[in-house]
């Protein structure tokens, strides 16, 4: 239907559509259409939106009045320039004017032009549309003389007030109405019909088509003839905004609205005073009736006083809400205004005008605007909607979550990542189908992302922390990779999200919407883990961000600080529960613990927290007390029977852990919680007290002996000590074999010590295999290998073992025996350097490892600069001193090795300086030099140049470059030393985790532990052990711990809010708000003074009338049967006291009494 209508209209308008090229300074281009007064507004609207490509407006403001001869006041021009254009700019509005270059329309066009030049966003565009009568256009014949395919050239002229005017070059579109001479004013009627039609159209933010276009008329000044247009628009329920102080009809309406009385006499008096010339009595009567009818629709009238009210966009929105309130109290009727408030991001107006309590909102009413607030990044509105009834658990479905990901801006980094994953997926599907180009499937359809791409992006950022996210949805599984879900899959997307706050937090933080993400973090569960996840994502995205500003904002995100502060709040409340918070397996993050997520995010500051270090200390010492001295530990290690004495003291948990076997029903006692949370889960401790009492004393003694033995040797500190001692023994054995007992190949060797060394290395290999492949059953072998190789110390182990295997293989053959010795000697050096790893546990030596690592990186950069000078000097001196020596080994020795020795002071002057060269026999014969019979003679032709180059080389390398290296080392040391404590604590965690997971026995005895674990895995399938760093709590206790964390989070947020209120900036803002309120109150006092002055004038008028009546009765012959009543004493006394002052009082200016000029008083604005 629309297309047929368009074709019919195009035929009707053939030759009446065209472009205009404005000549002059501006040189702009516009579009025009010439219509008749009977043209359907729907067809004109179709031309604007379909043929000319204008987006449907989010607001239409029709400028009425302001085309008078009087000069515009400066403040009025500023209001229109700044206020109206700003309000239109925030939404992409249409501004309808007369389109002619005179009066206020000209000033408004200039404001639109300034906005267009300053605006950088093509989406937010202010469109100025002129609706002008054809017969009032200067040079209108030029618009008809142009060819159909060529724009009309139109000169812009500033003409004086008269019958014709030029079109304003700052307007982009014109609707030129060809009026019938028999029907004057058809242009005004066309404007009224156009506004009515636009107000019935629907548009939406985000393309939802859900909002009726709000239309508003702005009255500036205005002649009486505008009242007819105003009344017709009011009959169409279009609200009006009246600009106070602009003069004309606008001031008349403002005055009457302030007085609250619009009797005919008062209205006529105001008309006569405002327009003293050119009005007949019949016109005054007609205008008076129109004014009274207009004022009867006060709900559609709003006054804007630029001196007192807020900005114009605020007043426009209030006017629209006011018009809606007067018509209905249903929530559905306020959705358009609410959506407009969302579009303008005016949450203050939404709170004060829409959510004031007059309207009852349901969750279903707010779902649509909630989506718009999410898509358009309006966190204040999201918070407002949640506070007013939106239930996130009911609101967020997988379908809506997918729509949120599909709405990501193309300029956002997330869009690039999702697009990349989608292209990889399409390429994979194309390879399976063997169909060539993977993009053929896309066509011209709108691009959409699925959860497959989202899960892949999260996998890149969070690794196993997001395992299973959005990967098991029925729609995704049945869709088979298609971009759009089939109809039978759509109902699956209506399923509600299991963790809505987590999903929204991830969606917001992936787009770097930090304020939105902060709100979702504050509302969601497991806040410490979520903050660390946000820290990890922000760090990863900061590396990928191409724009410096985005990368800087991502790096400045304070999610690690949030995690630290919240954990501090938890730790100060309860240390035991805080420990459990660190090691419990989370529900929302794929069973990962807080410590796992912190490790993934490399949150060094979080690990440096006292609470985290206290837990690590407890884990490090195992069941032993943390105040056990090292001397006692060493003594017990070498004399194991001391473990059953009081030399080693254990924690009291072993006495409480007997309750572990009881059901997890009693959770109200803190002691019971500690027993459940902090026990090490020893199977021996799980026996009931009754069974213990029934056993014999000998059985009890054996159990205690075995328990203390197991607790001592399974502690990570004991495991570490055993590994260190045995590793030193390994290095001693290795050095002994290399130096004293490295026998020839079989049958002479190897010796018994060397065979023991081979077996020792074999146990080391078994341990490395266990660490790499026997860690997580759910992980693929390739993934396990990748994680193993990522650790630098594991790389060192792989190099050491590989060299040992190569050396052992070469050592067994006589031909490669010496090569095998060489390789094993180098391998010993690698094994010895592996000792650096044990320093990480020491508080002073641990940071030094980081310093050495950083300095090695600095050395590589230094060597680049050094090699440039070294090669330049070495090659040059070799060419100058020994041009006849063709031996390659000596060329490299003199060109590279000798200049390198110069740096350390080894300068053989007898080989460089001709004055100190010895008189030895030498030759210049190449053959003798190659045979080595005589040394080559140095060339002394340019020996002075060699000396000069040596001086420059030593100056640059020994003074400049070496001092540069020292400065780099000093800077690295200073940076690391400032954060030495943080680096050490992070290293310490990794070391504790490593030795916590290691078997109790050290190599080579570790093979016993490996055999034991293998047998247990075959017999019991799973090991019956509890990991102190990963605990899966019972559901009741886990829920209680989550509730406790939520309470601490609320306390933390309350403290943040209190600190924010007490900050100097917030206090200044609060004081400023109070001052503004006081100023508004003072402005109200002025209004009251004006009202009181009016009342005084009226009372004085009434008194004079009464005095006149009394005097008339007194002079007449009429008499009353009784005497006149006497005035009360208070009034009489007051009259006598105030009589002298009243005699001298002057009448207020602008409020004359009836007795002086016989005119009714009115308030003069």
Swiss-Prot record:
Membrane topology (Extracellular): 741-751, 812-818, 881-889, 931-942
Effect of residue 853 to A: The antagonist NDNA fails to suppress channel activity
Disulfide bonds: none
Compositional bias ranges of the Basic and acidic residues kind: 1156-1165
MF terms (GO), sorted A to Z: calcium channel activity; calcium ion binding; calcium-activated cation channel activity; identical protein binding
Stretches in topological domain Cytoplasmic: 1-715, 772-792, 842-850, 978-1165
Residues the entry annotates as binding Ca(2+) 1: 212, 324, 333, 336-337
Residue ranges of the TM segments: 716-740, 752-771, 793-811, 819-841, 851-880, 943-977
The keyword Transmembrane helix appears for this protein: yes
UniProt xrefs under InterPro entries: Ion_trans_dom, TRPC_channel, TRPM, TRPM_SLOG
Gene Ontology cellular-component terms listed: plasma membrane
Phosphoserine: residues bearing it: 121
Motif window: Selectivity filter: 904-906
Effect of residue 836 to A: The antagonist NDNA fails to suppress channel activity
Cellular location(s): Cell membrane
Calcium listed as a keyword: no
Key words, A-Z: Cell membrane, Ion channel, Ion transport, Membrane, Phosphoprotein, Receptor, Transmembrane, Transmembrane helix, Transport
Record region (Disordered): 1122-1165
Membrane topology qualifier: Multi-pass membrane protein
PANTHER family on file: TRANSIENT RECEPTOR POTENTIAL CATION CHANNEL SUBFAMILY M MEMBER 5, TRANSIENT RECEPTOR POTENTIAL CATION CHANNEL, SUBFAMILY M, MEMBER 6
Subunit structure: Homotetramer.
Protein family membership: Belongs to the transient receptor (TC 1.A.4) family. LTrpC subfamily. TRPM5 sub-subfamily.
Record-given protein name: Transient receptor potential cation channel subfamily M member 5
Originating organism: Danio rerio
Gene name in the database record: trpm5
């Amino acid at each position: 239907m629309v297309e047929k209508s368009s074709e019919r209209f195009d035929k009707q308008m053939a030759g009446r559509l065209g472009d205009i090229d404005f000549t002059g300074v501006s040189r702009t281009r516009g579009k025009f259409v010439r219509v008749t007064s009977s043209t359907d507004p729907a067809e004109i609207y179709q031309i604007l939106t379909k043929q000319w490509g204008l987006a449907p407006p989010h607001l239409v403001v029709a400028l009425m009045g302001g085309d008078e001869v009087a000069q515009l006041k400066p403040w009025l021009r500023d209001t229109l320039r700044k206020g109206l254009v700003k309000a239109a700019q925030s939404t992409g509005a249409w501004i309808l004017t007369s389109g002619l270059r005179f009066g206020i329309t000209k000033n408004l066009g200039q404001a639109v032009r300034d906005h267009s030049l300053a605006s950088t966003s093509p989406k937010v565009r202010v469109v100025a549309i002129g609706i002008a009568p054809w017969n009032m256009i200067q040079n209108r014949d030029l618009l008809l003389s142009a060819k159909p395919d060529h724009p009309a050239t139109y000169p812009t002229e500033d003409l004086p007030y008269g019958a014709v005017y030029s079109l304003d070059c700052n307007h982009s579109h014109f609707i030129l109405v060809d009026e019938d001479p028999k029907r004057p004013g058809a242009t005004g009627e066309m404007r009224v019909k156009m506004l009515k039609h636009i107000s019935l159209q629907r548009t939406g933010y985000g393309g939802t088509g859900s909002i009726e276009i709000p239309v508003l008329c702005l009255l500036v000044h205005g002649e009486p003839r505008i009242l007819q247009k105003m009344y017709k628009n009011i009959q169409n329920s279009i609200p009006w905004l009246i600009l106070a102080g602009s003069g004309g009809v606008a001031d008349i309406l403002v005055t009457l609205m302030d007085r609250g009385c619009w009797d005919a006499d008062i209205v006529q008096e105001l008309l006569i005073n405002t327009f003293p010339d050119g009005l007949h009595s019949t016109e005054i009567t007609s205008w008076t009736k129109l004014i009274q009818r207009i004022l009867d629709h006060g709900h559609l009238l709003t006054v804007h006083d630029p001196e007192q009210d807020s900005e114009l966009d605020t007043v426009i929105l209030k006017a629209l809400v006011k018009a809606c309130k007067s018509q209905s109290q249903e929530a559905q009727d306020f959705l358009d205004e609410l959506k407009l408030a969302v579009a303008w991001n005016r949450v203050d107006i939404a709170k004060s005008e829409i959510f004031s309590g007059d309207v009852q909102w349901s969750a279903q009413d707010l779902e649509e605007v909630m989506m718009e607030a999410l898509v358009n990044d309006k966190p204040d509105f999201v918070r407002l909607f949640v506070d007013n009834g939106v239930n996130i658990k009911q609101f967020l479905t997988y379908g809506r979550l997918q729509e949120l990901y599909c709405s990501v801006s193309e300029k956002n980094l997330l869009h690039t990542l999702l697009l990349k994953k989608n292209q990889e997926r399409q390429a994979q599907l194309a390879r399976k189908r063997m169909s060539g180009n993977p993009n053929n499937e896309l066509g011209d359809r709108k691009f959409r992302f699925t959860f497959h791409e989202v899960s892949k992006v999260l996998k890149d950022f969070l690794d196993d922390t997001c395992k299973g996210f959005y990967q098991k949805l029925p729609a995704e599984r049945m869709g088979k990779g298609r971009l759009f879900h089939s109809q039978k899959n759509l109902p699956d997307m209506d399923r509600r999200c299991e963790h809505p706050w987590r999903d929204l937090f991830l969606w917001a933080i992936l787009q770097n919407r930090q304020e939105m993400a902060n709100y979702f973090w504050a509302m969601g569960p497991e806040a410490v883990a979520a903050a660390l996840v946000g820290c990890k994502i922000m760090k990863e995205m900061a590396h990928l961000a191409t724009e410096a500003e985005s990368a800087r904002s991502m790096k400045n995100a304070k999610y690690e600080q949030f995690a630290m502060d919240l954990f501090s709040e938890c730790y100060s409340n309860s240390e035991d529960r805080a420990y459990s918070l660190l090691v419990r397996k989370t529900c929302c993050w794929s069973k990962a613990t807080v410590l796992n997520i912190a490790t993934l995010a490399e949150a060094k500051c979080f690990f440096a927290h006292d609470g985290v270090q206290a837990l690590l200390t407890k884990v490090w010492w195992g069941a032993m007390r943390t105040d056990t001295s090292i001397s006692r530990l060493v003594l017990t290690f070498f004399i194991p029977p001391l473990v059953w004495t009081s030399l080693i003291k254990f924690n009291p948990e072993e006495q409480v852990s007997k309750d572990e076997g009881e059901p997890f029903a009693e959770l109200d006692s803190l002691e019971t919680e500690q027993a459940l949370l902090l026990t090490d889960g020893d199977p021996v401790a799980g026996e009931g007290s009754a069974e213990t009492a029934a056993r014999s004393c000998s059985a009890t003694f054996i159990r205690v002996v075995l328990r203390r033995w197991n607790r001592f040797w399974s502690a990570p500190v004991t495991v570490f000590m055993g590994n260190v001692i045995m590793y030193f023994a390994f290095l001693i054995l290795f050095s002994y074999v290399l130096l004293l007992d490295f026998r020839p190949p079989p049958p002479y060797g190897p010796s018994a010590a060397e065979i023991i060394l081979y077996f020792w290395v074999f146990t080391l290999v078994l341990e490395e295999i266990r660490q790499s492949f026997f860690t997580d059953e759910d992980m693929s072998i390739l993934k396990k290998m990748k994680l193993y190789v990522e650790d630098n110390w594991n790389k060192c182990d792989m190099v050491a073992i590989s060299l040992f295997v190569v050396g052992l293989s070469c050592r067994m053959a006589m031909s490669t025996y010496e090569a095998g010795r060489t390789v094993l000697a180098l391998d010993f050096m690698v094994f010895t350097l592996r000792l650096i790893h044990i320093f990480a546990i020491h508080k002073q030596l641990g940071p030094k490892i980081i310093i050495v690592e950083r300095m090695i990186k600095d050395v590589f950069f230094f060597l680049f600069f050094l090699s440039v000078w070294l090669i330049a000097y070495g090659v040059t001196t070799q060419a100058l001193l020994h041009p006849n020596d063709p031996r390659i080994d000596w060329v490299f020795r003199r060109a590279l090795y000798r200049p390198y020795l110069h740096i350390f002071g080894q300068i053989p002057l007898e080989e460089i300086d001709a004055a100190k060269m010895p008189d030895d026999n030498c030759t210049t014969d190449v053959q003798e030099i190659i045979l080595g019979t005589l040394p080559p003679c140095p060339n002394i032709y340019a020996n002075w140049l060699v000396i000069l180059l040596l001086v420059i080389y030593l100056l640059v390398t020994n003074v400049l470059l070496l001092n540069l290296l020292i400065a780099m080392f000093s800077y690295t040391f200073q940076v690391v030393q400032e954060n030495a404590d943080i680096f050490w604590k992070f290293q310490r965690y990794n070391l504790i985790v490593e030795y916590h997971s290691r078997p109790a026995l050290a190599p080579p005895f570790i093979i016993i532990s490996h055999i034991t674990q293998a047998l247990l895995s075959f017999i019991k399938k799973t090991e019956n052990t509890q990991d102190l760093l990963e605990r899966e709590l019972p559901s009741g206790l886990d829920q209680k711990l989550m509730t406790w964390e939520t309470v601490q989070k609320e306390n933390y947020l309350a403290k943040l809010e209190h600190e924010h209120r007490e900050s100097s900036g917030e206090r200044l803002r609060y004081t400023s708000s109070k001052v503004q309120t006081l100023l508004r109150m003072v402005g109200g006092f002025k209004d009251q003074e004006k009202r009181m002055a009016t009342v005084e004038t009226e009372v004085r008028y009434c008194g004079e009338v009464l005095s006149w009546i009394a005097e008339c009765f007194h002079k007449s012959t009429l008499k009353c049967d009784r005497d006149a009543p006497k005035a009360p004493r208070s009034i009489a006394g007051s009259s006598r006291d105030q009589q002298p002052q009243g005699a001298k009082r002057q009448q207020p200016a602008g409020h004359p009494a009836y007795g002086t000029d016989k005119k009714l008083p009115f308030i003069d604005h």
